[in-house]
A protein has these predicted regions:
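Hinge/lid segment of periplasmic solute-binding proteins
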Residues: 24-35, 100-151, 163-174, 186, ...
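Extracytoplasmic/periplasmic solute-binding protein
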Residues: 141-147, 152, 172-231, 258, ...
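C-terminal lobe and pocket-closing loops
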Residues: 28, 34-35, 275-289, 302-402, ...
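Short, solvent-exposed loop/beta-turn-alpha elements that line the ligand-binding surface or hinge
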Residues: 31-38, 116-128, 190-195, 211-231, ...
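Conserved C-terminal helix/tail region of periplasmic/extracytoplasmic solute-binding proteins
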Residues: 26-28, 34-40, 68-69, 381-438
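Glycine-centered hinge/linker elements that transmit conformational signals in sensory
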Residues: 174-175, 219-251, 294, 298
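Short, well-ordered beta-strand elements
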Residues: 37-48, 67-72, 95-96, 188, ...
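Extracytoplasmic "Venus flytrap"/periplasmic binding protein-like
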Residues: 60-128, 137, 159-166, 260-261, ...
């Protein structure tokens, strides 16, 4: 039986209504009509299960937009060199770039600012904790989204330590108690090695900021030689040189070594990023079980705790020939619904994914996400209430290296006060040479 004219018109009209409804329901502010259908984006990313989980779901993005993606995963230790090389080459090999926040300022000139895109699509950086949002910004411009970001927590052996330390004095007391009890374990794992990634500044910043000190003063000069800052630095180093509660290998430890020390049952406490929890209770990586590992907020130094936060934003390369399509990808990649699934679903496309990292304020407080991850997001949210990031200036890598060297030498027995003062003098020369200060 053939269609009458009225039936045909009704059918077409119904189809148009359905198409319009489907387009209106396109999520995350993605553009209607697949305007970038057939585009292929190249994504540079650090190696992590979190991003494995996103990559394994990117067929959802392709179905919505017609845009395909090709991911290149680089170990963290090699990523900075790769990012720097991409900026120098300026050939747009990668459309979307993942980097550590402190690498942002030296590379900001070739990372697209996304503020106009965000305004057009109704996206606000207020969806992130202030420290995370700040870490993806440079000189008033937003350079990307902090998709991987971390709060610091104190992890401890709850089978050996009944109550977590509330202060660094408590850390020392607990350490002495473990030593006096003859426990065959080092009380505390720290990482003083001058490794080139400035990891030995991570805990030092907690002491500095809690004491009321700053890295730079209001005029941009080194400020870590104020009396309160020097005292804080001395107290940080004294955990190793005077209290002697640290693992003896802390001088040579980088962060990964310290984590391994904890996971192998050789250290009883470690202040480290929250993401480490999943590996600490993973039998393929750790000798410990969930019954042995607990976590709490970072200890206070003096009357308060001020923590260091870090992030690894994703940005659009200014050299990309597919900037608009890359923005579509960032909108999808950063949406809170996807982030929630990635922190609660333990298998994607047949692959096991264990990830507890979320960066949206809503997800940090989400009861389902917390229930799936031993409430570690709630602890991280508490840590982030009073947190800050490393200075966002192009000269920071050089200045940070000077500081990192001073910390390592102080932990090895040098005079903390003299080394930090000399570091300030060196840093001042660097900043003057760069025109940052007069």
């Amino acid at each position: 039986m053939g269609l009458t004219r009225s039936t045909l018109l009704a059918t077409v009209a119904a189809g148009l209504v359905m198409t319009s409804a489907q387009a209106a329901e396109l999520p995350y502010g993605l553009k209607e009509g697949k305007p970038y259908d057939g585009t292929k984006l190249n994504v540079l990313s650090v190696v992590t299960p979190q991003f494995d989980g996103l990559m394994l779901r990117d067929s959802e993005f392709t179905e919505l937009t017609g845009i395909e993606t090709e991911w290149t995963f680089i170990p963290f230790g090699s990523l900075q060199e790769k990012v720097t090389a991409e900026g120098i080459a300026a050939n747009g090999q990668f459309d979307v770039i993942n980097y550590l926040d402190s690498w942002g300022p030296p590379n900001a000139h070739w990372l697209e600012s996304i503020d106009e895109w965000m305004e057009a699509d109704g996206i606000s950086m207020d969806r992130y904790p202030p420290a995370f949002a700040k870490s993806a910004q440079y000189e008033g411009e937003t350079k990307g989204f902090p998709l991987r970001a971390h709060a610091q927590l104190m992890f401890y052996r709850k089978d050996l330590i009944p109550e977590p330390p509330a202060t660094w004095d408590d850390v020392i007391r607990i350490g002495k108690e473990l030593q006096d009890a003859g426990e065959d374990i080092s009380p505390l794992a720290l990482y003083f090695n001058n490794d080139g990634n400035r990891q030995n500044l991570f805990i030092w910043l907690n002491f500095l900021w809690a004491a009321g000190g700053e890295v730079f003063d209001a005029d941009g000069y080194p400020a870590w030689t104020s009396e309160e800052a020097l005292k804080a630095s001395e107290d940080y180093i004294a955990l190793h040189t005077q209290a002697k509660i640290t693992n003896p290998a802390s001088l040579s430890f980088v962060e990964q070594d310290a984590r391994q020390s904890f996971m192998q049952g050789k250290s009883a406490m470690i202040p480290v990023w929250w993401w480490a929890y999943s590996s600490m209770i993973n039998p393929e990586q750790s000798t410990l079980t969930a019954d042995q590992v607990a976590f709490a907020g970072m200890p206070a130094y003096g009357e308060k705790a001020v923590t260091y936060a870090i992030s690894m934003p994703f940005s659009v390369s200014s050299h990309s020939k597919n900037k608009e399509a890359s923005w579509e990808f960032l909108k999808w990649l950063s949406n809170p619904d996807l982030e929630k699934r990635n922190a609660t679903e333990r298998e994607v496309e047949g692959k096991s994914i264990i990830n507890n990292v979320v960066t949206h304020v809503a997800n940090l407080q989400d009861p389902d996400i917390n229930a799936a991850n031993a409430n570690i997001q709630d602890a991280a949210w508490g840590s982030l209430e009073n947190s800050n990031i490393m200075p966002q200036i192009p000269e920071w890598p050089e200045v940070g290296d000077i500081l990192s060297t001073a910390i390592a030498e102080a932990a090895a027995g040098g005079s903390t006060r003299e080394l930090m003062t000399a570091a300030a003098e060196q840093a001042t020369k660097v900043l003057k040479r760069a025109g940052r200060i007069e």
